[in-house]
Amino acid sequence: MRKHLGGCWLAIVCILLFSQLCSVKARGIKHRIKWNRKVLPSTSQVTEARTAEIRPGAFIKQGRKLDIDFGVEGNRYYEANYWQFPDGIHYNGCSKANVTKEKFITSCINATQAANQEELSREKQDNKLYQRVLWQLIRELCSTKHCDFWLERGAGLRVTLDQPMMLCLLVFIWFIVK
């Protein structure tokens, strides 16, 4: 019985150490040498145009096709024209500590609507279908965003973030068993 408990403790310690080592990124000598690297712009060099590009609610268009169900007709239209649609939204509304998921999604949609008025009101031949697919895409993109503090409300320990607490818990249990 004593050897079995020792093996369990050894397995737990190995798992904790392995999870710690997996989160550490290895960096070799190549990363220390800064050959041909561009100098990052200072805050004084950031122009209004660059700031306008990353305003809250701005679309991110990289030409990726997303896996979202728009209905039969909408899916066909999206398959043919996915490159015209955004595949992300610049939005970080997590500054308020008490924001709920519903409020976050609503404010994300409102910010996106305000930031992209010309594209949302653009006249196209297939305007109704384009608008329907675009609005469903915006709702879906806003609903997939999340705030880190929502995770903290859940129960349980996260091994990667609570490792000191796990170590203290292991030491405490070890003293109780001993």
UniProtKB/Swiss-Prot annotation:
Q: List the disulfide bonds.
A: C94-C147, C108-C142
Compartment annotation = Cell membrane
Q: What is its main location?
A: membrane
Q: Which residues are annotated as pro-peptide in the record?
A: 155-178
Gene3D superfamilies given in the database record: Prion/Doppel protein, beta-ribbon domain
Regions crossing the membrane: none
Q: Name one GO biological process term.
A: acrosome reaction
Cleavable signal peptide: 1-25
Please describe the organ and tissue distribution of this protein's expression: Strongly expressed in testis. Detected at low levels in ovary, spleen, kidney and mammary gland.
Q: How is it modified after translation?
A: N-glycosylated.
Sugar attachment sites: N98, N110
Query: Matching SUPFAM superfamilies, A to Z?
Result: Prion-like
Q: Where is this region: Flexible tail?
A: 27-50
**Keywords assigned by UniProt, alphabetized:** Amyloid, Cell membrane, Copper, Disulfide bond, Fertilization, Glycoprotein, GPI-anchor, Lipoprotein, Membrane, Metal-binding, Prion, Signal
Q: Where is the lipid attached (GPI-anchor amidated glycine)?
A: G154
Q: How does it sit in the membrane?
A: Lipid-anchor; GPI-anchor
InterPro entries associated with the record: Doppel, Prion/Doppel_b-ribbon_dom_sf, Prion/Doppel_prot_b-ribbon_dom
Q: Which GO terms describe its cellular component?
A: external side of plasma membrane
Q: Where does the record place the region Globular?
A: 51-154
Gene Ontology molecular functions: copper ion binding
Give me the ranges of the annotated region Cu(2+) binding.
124-141
Q: Which family does it belong to?
A: Belongs to the prion family.
Q: How are the domains described in the entry?
A: A short helical region is required and sufficient for Cu(2+) binding.
The job of this chain, per UniProt, is described as: Required for normal acrosome reaction and for normal male fertility. Can bind Cu(2+).
| Designated name of the protein | Prion-like protein doppel
- Organism, by scientific name, is Bos taurus (Bovine)
Gene that encodes the chain: PRND
